[in-house]
Swiss-Prot record:
<dbReference type="InterPro" id="IPR009068">
    <property type="entry name" value="uS15_NS1_RNA-bd_sf"/>
</dbReference>
<dbReference type="Pfam" id="PF00579">
    <property type="entry name" value="tRNA-synt_1b"/>
</dbReference>
<feature type="short sequence motif" description="'KMSKS' region">
    <location>
        <begin position="353"/>
        <end position="357"/>
    </location>
</feature>
<keyword id="KW-0963">Cytoplasm</keyword>
<comment type="function">
    <text>Catalyzes the attachment of tryptophan to tRNA(Trp) in a two-step reaction: tryptophan is first activated by ATP to form Trp-AMP and then transferred to the acceptor end of the tRNA(Trp). Could also possess an angiostatic activity.</text>
</comment>
<dbReference type="GO" id="GO:0019210">
    <property type="term" value="F:kinase inhibitor activity"/>
</dbReference>
<dbReference type="InterPro" id="IPR000738">
    <property type="entry name" value="WHEP-TRS_dom"/>
</dbReference>
<feature type="short sequence motif" description="'HIGH' region">
    <location>
        <begin position="168"/>
        <end position="177"/>
    </location>
</feature>
<protein>
    <recommendedName>
        <fullName>Tryptophan--tRNA ligase, cytoplasmic</fullName>
        <ecNumber>6.1.1.2</ecNumber>
    </recommendedName>
</protein>
<keyword id="KW-0436">Ligase</keyword>
<dbReference type="InterPro" id="IPR002306">
    <property type="entry name" value="Trp-tRNA-ligase"/>
</dbReference>
<dbReference type="GO" id="GO:0001525">
    <property type="term" value="P:angiogenesis"/>
</dbReference>
<dbReference type="GO" id="GO:0045765">
    <property type="term" value="P:regulation of angiogenesis"/>
</dbReference>
<comment type="similarity">
    <text>Belongs to the class-I aminoacyl-tRNA synthetase family.</text>
</comment>
<dbReference type="GO" id="GO:0031334">
    <property type="term" value="P:positive regulation of protein-containing complex assembly"/>
</dbReference>
<keyword id="KW-0597">Phosphoprotein</keyword>
<keyword id="KW-0547">Nucleotide-binding</keyword>
Length: 481
């Protein structure tokens, strides 16, 4: 077994912190497996060396579960003051100093949204007659805007539709990208409503070093993964901005209306644009806003302007739709309603979300069973203790343990999840056992997704992406054919 790299080779305090955590897990596993004494001694020596390097770099002792935030200042790992100053969320950046991740209660206050409480979850269950999705039960979708209006419409047999999207920046999607689509699929099933999915390949062309052809090819590849989530082809329209803008005058007209009613000062304040940003970036928010208005899709909704949409998305997309909600009544449309999700953490910890640009921070939908096992074992941040003895005595910290966080997303059984939480917190379950549980959940989940994706043909993609009339059964949707 290869030694961990020395502290001097780490390029940042966070990397050094993660190296200590990984080396600590190695020491625990060697002791638990009754490895030869010289091998254990060598691993312990490396662990002590890493901790000394950390202290030299940070000016303080390594503390399990408290990754470095400010490398030059003394800090209390989870103090409110630190969290308030370090939490940062916009459509491109998610950052916090807390190992527990973003303080979502504070984000609700900051963004001015409403918490999804037990009363709202119960109302969704009554309206649909279905058990709430685990993402609702566990607070993964935690915030909303005007969800009660959507339920009012549904209960009164009035129409609404779903809108979500994907910015295709690479061929392979990762686990975090699945979250809004898994939930949107459930919403489509229980409410039996049409869905539009925007592929913002124009956005990725503007922000990334891509050609137009690359951006569109990523749209097609990502669409296959989205289709593999099981969406109903008779109720789902997937569209590329680069393609659909030229096919739908109604869509472009809404873009222009939005552009006229939002000033540069407004978008600069909302999105942080600077004088050096290209004009395409400055105008793009109007493109993401336009699908919120039903007459952007005349093949589906004809010229109706009064049909509200519900947008399931990660909370970092909310700035786009705060702008949209401000504009909507001024151009004759209802405000879109929203359901916000938490972020899917990187393997290295909840300080940031999973990123497709860092292969070691992400589990991709193309990963093999072997790659999944290796990534979880090597890179998933642990809330465990430095030694087996300490872990048995004091237990692990589920609030910072990435493997447990991932199980809250993908393990359906509530009772089993609660038992895992109790066992890990009490010390009855070790980090290696928790990681094995996660691996056993993820490997079949991704293998099944890969099998469904393999069955998606180019013809299927074309059918999903062709503008057409969709099938739905609300009384108010009874158009003449």
């Amino acid at each position: 077994m290869a030694d961990m790299p020395s502290g001097e080779s780490c390029t940042s305090p966070l990397e050094l912190f993660n190296s200590i955590a990984t080396q600590g897990e190695l020491v625990r596993s060697l002791k638990a497996g009754n490895a030869p004494k010289d091998e254990i001694d060598s691993a312990v020596k490396m662990l002590l060396s890493l901790k000394m390097s950390y202290k030299a770099a940070m000016g303080e002792e390594y503390k399990a579960g408290c990754p470095p935030g400010n490398p030059t200042a003394g800090r209390n790992c989870d103090s409110d003051a630190t969290k308030a100053s370090e939490d940062f969320v916009d459509p491109w950046t998610v950052r916090t100093s807390s190992a527990k991740g973003i303080d979502y209660d504070k984000l609700i206050v900051q963004f001015g949204s409403s918490k999804i409480d037990k009363e709202l979850i119960n109302r969704i269950e009554r309206a649909t007659g279905q058990r709430p999705h685990r993402f609702l039960r566990r607070g993964i979708f935690f915030s909303h805007r005007d969800m009660n209006q959507i339920l009012d419409a549904y209960e009164n047999k009035k129409p609404f539709y779903l809108y979500t999207g994907r910015g295709p920046s690479s061929e392979a999607m990762h686990l975090g990208h699945l979250v809004p689509f898994i939930f949107t699929k459930w919403l489509q099933d229980v409410f039996n409503v049409p869905l539009v999915i925007q592929m913002s390949d124009d956005e990725k062309y503007l922000w990334k070093d891509l050609t137009l052809e690359q951006a569109y090819s990523y749209t097609v590849e990502n669409a296959k993964d989205i289709i593999a989530c099981g969406f109903d082809i008779n109720k789902t329209f997937i569209f590329s901005d680069l393609e659909y803008m030229g096919q739908s005058p109604g869509f472009y007209r809404n873009v222009v209306k939005i552009q006229k009613h939002v000033t540069f000062n407004q978008v600069k304040g909302i999105f942080g644009f600077t004088d050096s940003d290209c004009i395409g970036k400055i105008s793009f928010p109007a493109v993401q806003a336009a699908p919120s208005f039903s007459n952007s899709f005349p093949k589906i909704f004809r010229d109706r302007t009064d049909i509200q949409c519900l947008i399931p998305c990660a909370i970092d997309q909310d700035p786009y739709f705060r702008m949209t909600r401000d504009v909507a009544p001024r151009i004759g449309h209802p405000k879109p309603a929203l359901l916000h999700s938490t972020f899917f953490p990187a393997l290295q910890g909840a300080q940031t979300k999973m990123s497709a640009s860092d292969p070691n921070s992400s589990i991709f939908l193309t990963d093999t069973a072997k790659q999944i096992k290796s990534k979880v074992n090597k890179h998933a941040f642990s809330g465990g203790r430095d030694t087996v003895e300490e872990h048995r005595q004091f237990g692990g910290n589920c609030e910072v343990d990435v493997s447990f966080m991932y199980l809250t997303f993908f393990l359906e059984d509530d009772d089993r999840l609660e038992q895992i939480r109790k066992d890990y917190t009490s010390g009855a379950m070790l980090t290696g056992e928790l990681k094995k549980t996660l691996i056993d959940v993820l490997q079949p989940l991704i293998a099944e997704h890969q099998a469904r994706r393999k069955a998606v043909t180019e013809e299927t993609v074309k059918e999903f992406m062709t503008p057409r009339q969709l099938s739905f059964h609300f009384q108010c949707f009874c158009f003449d054919t």
